[in-house]
Regions:
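A positional/architectural concept
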Residues: 1-57
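Charge/polar-rich, low-complexity and marginally structured segments
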Residues: 50, 55-172
Length: 172
């Protein structure tokens, strides 16, 4: 169960803080609801407390997970799918899971493609969305703000020569 003050992640909206827990009567049934403030979009999200995990709400990763996250951003297989539509859908679906490592994989794949052939406008938007979602969670894990989290993500990405990776994968 989540309590007021818990830092959580909603798979579609990013990371936030539980700001309120209250009982509400909906369709004649009294239920507990959580109000989650999502700073990324300044959204107040109301989620049934007993169904929060079922919709994918989870706790923010801990600082100890950041090293694994950095490894995911910098190493691993690169998907060479040539069909833009399939590649876009697969990346979008990975982002929708809300899984921090799936989002990091999307960022890695799009960073390589960006340094190779470049990104389409749709992929560029997806790349920016993935970085914002990841930063919304990294900020809580690192105890910083979103800008500092984005700087950390960009620093990790830039630590790898994606141009060399793209060239080796024949994406140049």
């Amino acid at each position: 169960m989540f309590e007021v003050g818990d830092k959580v992640v909603h798979p579609h909206h990013g990371a936030g803080v539980v700001t309120r827990r209250e009982s509400r009567t909906v369709l004649g049934e009294e239920r507990e609801y959580l109000t989650i403030h999502i700073p990324l979009t300044d959204l107040l999200l109301n989620v049934p407390a007993d169904g929060a995990e079922a919709v994918g709400v989870r706790r923010v990763i801990g600082e100890a997970v950041l090293e694994d996250l950095a490894r995911t951003l910098t190493a691993g297989d690169i998907e060479l799918e040539g069909n833009w539509n399939r590649r876009f859908r697969r990346n979008r679906d990975k982002i929708k899971t809300g899984d921090v490592f799936e989002i990091a994989e999307v960022i890695r794949h799009l960073a390589v493609r960006d340094h190779g052939r470049g990104l389409s406008s749709g992929e560029r938007q997806l790349y920016a969305q993935a970085k914002r979602l990841l930063a919304s969670e990294v900020q809580y894990a690192r105890g910083t703000d979103e800008d500092e989290a984005l700087i950390w993500i960009e620093g990790v990405i830039e630590s790898v020569s994606y141009a060399q990776v793209a060239e080796a994968a024949h994406l140049e």
